[in-house]
Amino acid sequence: MDAFVRLKDARFGEPVVPDEYTFAAVVSAAAALPAMHSGMPLHAEVVKAGLETSVFVGNTLINMYFTNGESGSARILFDSLPEKDVIMWTEMVAGHSSSGEAELALKYFISMLQEGYKVDSFSLSSALNSTAEFAGLKQGEMLHAQVVKSGYEGNICASGSLLDMYAKNGALQGAHLVFYTIPKRDLKCWNSMIGGYGNYGNSEMAFKLFGEMIRDELQPDHVTYISLLSACSHCGLVEKGKFYWFCMMTDGIMPGFKHYTSMVSLLGRAGLLEEAVDLLQKSPFAKKCPELWRILLSSCVALNDLSVGIHAAEQALAQDPDDMSTHVLLSNLYAAAGKWDVVAEIRKKIRGMMVEKEPGLSWIEIKSTIHVFSADDECHSQIDDCRGELLRLKGNMELLYSSENELLSSG
């Protein structure tokens, strides 16, 4: 940046005017800095220099905006450019994918294909990563066809993302087939497969694959142990969970939030509440992550343990006093203990919180279109159609119920 400023200010008879290559280099260097401090002023300089339509400079500006989490600015710039190249389209797919905007990443990928651009393994990988996070198996299967069509079946980048997509969507047979077609599987591939089996309740296969991975002389990382501990938690395998926790510590991997989440859940659901409290209190997350205390509280509700449950609720509410889910769990805990006067007080507080709380949104995908709605939503464009369909279904259910009653009475 300093060199660029000196270049601009230099005077050797005529001012030195930076060209598109200079701007591209400077914008790339400034991408790691906050956009407001360096990127946006540089963008203004690009416009002043008359280079705002340069594809070369545009690519670096779009990358800079995505690096700074300014995806909206990246879209505005992209739409304003009269000419685009394959690098720019790939940047739009990858940028939205890495920023968690899966639907937009897929939208730009499809538009890229429609515009006739040839996709590479990187753009395919980014699109597949989006379907994995988006839980879009149908779109993922379509992208699988594109991987085959483009000749990237043996490519570790595309195949690894394809495997991850199938595993996260619970399509374990598809994941299994892809996994064993990859000639040189890296740690990410093994982690995806172990995680897929673990998250969907097949702990036996998860542990078997882990053994194969060790025999292949791959060193497990923190993601591997998240998957293994999650598998133990899902299946209630306490001793196995403790074993993998010990292995993780032996490997010199410090447990993170997700590791503690699985262990607290595992110990809590097994009724080992005191062990769970001890583990949690010794963790670095005890004073800053109320989610862990809520997990413990949920186990206390299931086991009707009032004393540990109250302690867990106090810890969670000390960090997040307005969390409604903690209040609801605490209410259920007191209800199970028959303390209805306390339940009434908590529920009164919950009602007050509901008045102040902004409604959450839900979404559903129907025929490749995302529909967003909330409770008591009167503004949706198809609200009348929805009501009509509900009435039709209600009528069918009532008709079926009356028919069953007639059959029973006649029998």
Task: Show where each model-derived region lies.
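Terminal (and in a subset, N-terminal) low-complexity or junction segments at the ends
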Residues: 1-411
